[in-house]
């Protein structure tokens, strides 16, 4: 293997801003920002969604309307589309 071609693997703090949670995870992501947690300075990255805020993981799934996209389209624009085949 060639020396000095691999990215630096280190502990990085990811901040889920939607729920104000911090995660210390090993990563190779590059960032110029830093944060101090527990007396140690870590690289810092903000994220919008994580396992603490995503509806799939939190169990707070949105209820999906019973009609799909095609039904909504037909309801809105059905009067403009001919129902006869081949015309």
Curated annotation (Swiss-Prot):
The keyword Kinase does not apply. It holds the Pfam family Ribosomal_L31. GO terms for biological process: translation. It comes from the Bacteria. One of its GO terms (cellular component) is ribosome. InterPro entries: Ribosomal_bL28/bL31-like_sf, Ribosomal_bL31, Ribosomal_bL31_B, Ribosomal_bL31_sf. GO terms for molecular function: structural constituent of ribosome. Keywords: Ribonucleoprotein, Ribosomal protein. Belongs to the bacterial ribosomal protein bL31 family. Type B subfamily. HAMAP family: Ribosomal_bL31_2. Part of the 50S ribosomal subunit. This is Large ribosomal subunit protein bL31B. It comes from Escherichia coli (strain SE11).
